[in-house]
Swiss-Prot record:
Keyword Lipid biosynthesis appears in the UniProt entry: no
Gene3D superfamilies: Glycoside hydrolase/deacetylase
The gene coding this protein: pxpA
Organism: Paraburkholderia xenovorans (strain LB400)
Protein name: 5-oxoprolinase subunit A
GO MF entries: 5-oxoprolinase (ATP-hydrolyzing) activity; ATP binding
Lineage of source species: Bacteria, Pseudomonadati, Pseudomonadota, Betaproteobacteria, Burkholderiales
Keyword annotations: ATP-binding, Hydrolase, Nucleotide-binding
Annotated EC: 3.5.2.9
Listed InterPro entries: Glyco_hydro/deAcase_b/a-brl, LamB/YcsF/PxpA-like
Protein family: Belongs to the LamB/PxpA family.
Length: 250
């Protein structure tokens, strides 16, 4: 049994280099919600050194809201924005001896793409036109998974052990009760059950089937790094191997 562990990096949390010792895939902010050229280069260099798959983490151009505010943009704007951010990270990766192997949208762009086919299609078109061997990390069972596969891209289905789920498989919005789970023991147990049982219990008690191919480890918060180490250790103890997913395995 195996799983991919991913983390969002280059967002100013200060633990990027240490997190790269624990994950197999890195989603690197491309400057539109956080980060910038130097942060991108640092994260890419560390990822190359540690053998971690490099991924772009594009967002809406919204640093004021950390990319978490929903936007109603034309599909052409979304396409161009994703391609622009991909190109920036790819140039840095090439200079450092690496390559962009996957794309994971950030924040509102991620959530809107999960349910809005117009946005999902714009994202996957940009990825496909950039490099059709690049994988797309998307919320498990979401419309972005479908859109990626419809154009022949590898879709890697992502789950979150520390986020609340609705019965339809979507995430509970951050401002609503039950959105974030802060009991580390419960999150740890949930991580293992998601991998083993391929399902998650929604906030209303229903069980939602899902295809857990990659799990996001959040790197922000005062105890995030220590907890990430606990999760990695628990996976090792359970005999679950950690490997990069998608194009990075090719």
């Amino acid at each position: 049994m195996e799983i991919d562990l991913n983390a969002d990096l280059g967002e100013g949390c200060g633990s990027d280099e240490a997190l790269l010792d624990l994950v197999s895939s890195a989603n690197i902010a491309c400057g539109w919600h956080a980060g910038g050229a130097n942060a991108m280069r640092d994260c890419v260099r560390w990822a190359v050194q540690k053998g971690v798959s490099i991924g772009a983490h594009p967002s809406f151009n919204d640093p004021e809201n950390f990319g978490r505010k929903e936007m109603d943009l034309p599909a052409n704007d979304i396409y161009a924005g994703v391609l622009y951010q991909l190109g920036a990270l790819s140039a840095i990766a090439q200079a450092e001896g690496g390559r962009v192997a996957h794309v994971k949208p950030h924040g509102a762009l991620y959530n809107q793409a999960a349910r809005d086919s117009r946005i999902a299609d714009a994202i996957v078109s940009a990825v496909h036109d950039f490099d059709p061997s690049v994988a797309v990390f998307a919320l498990a069972n979401s419309g972005l998974v479908t859109a990626a596969r419809n154009v022949g891209l590898i879709a890697v289905e992502e789950v979150f052990a520390d986020r609340g789920y609705r019965a339809d498989g979507s995430l509970v919005p951050r401002k609503e009760p039950g959105a974030l789970l802060d009991d580390e023991d419960k999150v740890l147990a949930r991580t293992l059950s998601m991998i083993r049982e391929q399902r998650v219990q929604a906030v209303d008690g229903q069980w939602v089937p899902l295809n857990a191919q990659t799990i996001c480890l959040h790197g922000d918060g005062p105890h995030a790094l220590a907890f990430a180490r606990r999760i990695r250790g628990a996976l090792q103890d359970a005999g679950i191997e950690v490997h990069a997913a998608g194009a990075a395995r090719a």
